[in-house]
Amino acid sequence: MGVDIRHNKDRKVHRTEPKSQDIYLRLLVKLYRFLARRSDAPFNKVVLKRLFMSKTNRPPLALSRLIRKMKLQGRENKIAVVVGTITDDVRILNIPKLKVCALRVTAGARRRILKAGGQVMTFDQLAVTTPKGQGTVLLSGPRKAREVYRHFGKAPGTPHSHTKPYIRSKGRKFERARGRRASRGYKN
């Protein structure tokens, strides 16, 4: 007798709407859904997809990284578009004139961008200015920068693994001897 095929893992998971009940986000989704359908520009489709994403997949972008990415050749006078938050970076002293569009900009970052003669736009303003995303640079924050990613990967304690172990304490007695120093068995 044959065994029937398991259908419990068949589903390909992709969001068709945001999980959030935020009415302002839902209005943006309505707008970009219209633009993605009516224009052939891939920009609108990408923005729409990113509006659906969870918060961990929309990591914050620091002002320093934004400046570094906008300094690249051919990106002057373009609008930096971030589907997420732009955060301030106190390590940066001189800020160039920037034109940015983001879901959220922290108070410090907003103040410094405007002080430098820049401009902060919302996504509905962007849709009016560039409905097809002409003259824009789509940026996103570092997704793997979260602390939890340090624990992922090859099991801690195996050769050539740099994975951070989950331990209750960082004391001398906790995962610091065997495999960490040559005098105690071996060193990775």
From Swiss-Prot:
One of its GO terms (molecular function) is RNA binding. Disulfide bonds: none annotated. The keyword Cell wall biogenesis/degradation does not apply. It comes from the Eukaryota. It is found in: Cytoplasm, Cytosol; Cytoplasm; Rough endoplasmic reticulum. The keyword Zinc-finger does not apply. Pfam families: Ribosomal_L18. Residues 161-171, 178-188 have a biased composition (Basic residues). GO terms for biological process: cytoplasmic translation. GO terms for cellular component: cytosolic large ribosomal subunit; rough endoplasmic reticulum. Residues 153-188 are annotated as: Disordered. Keywords: Cytoplasm, Endoplasmic reticulum, Ribonucleoprotein, Ribosomal protein. Component of the large ribosomal subunit. The ribosome is a large ribonucleoprotein complex responsible for the synthesis of proteins in the cell. Belongs to the eukaryotic ribosomal protein eL18 family. Component of the large ribosomal subunit. This is Large ribosomal subunit protein eL18. It comes from Ictalurus punctatus (Channel catfish). The lineage of its organism: Eukaryota, Metazoa, Chordata, Craniata, Vertebrata.
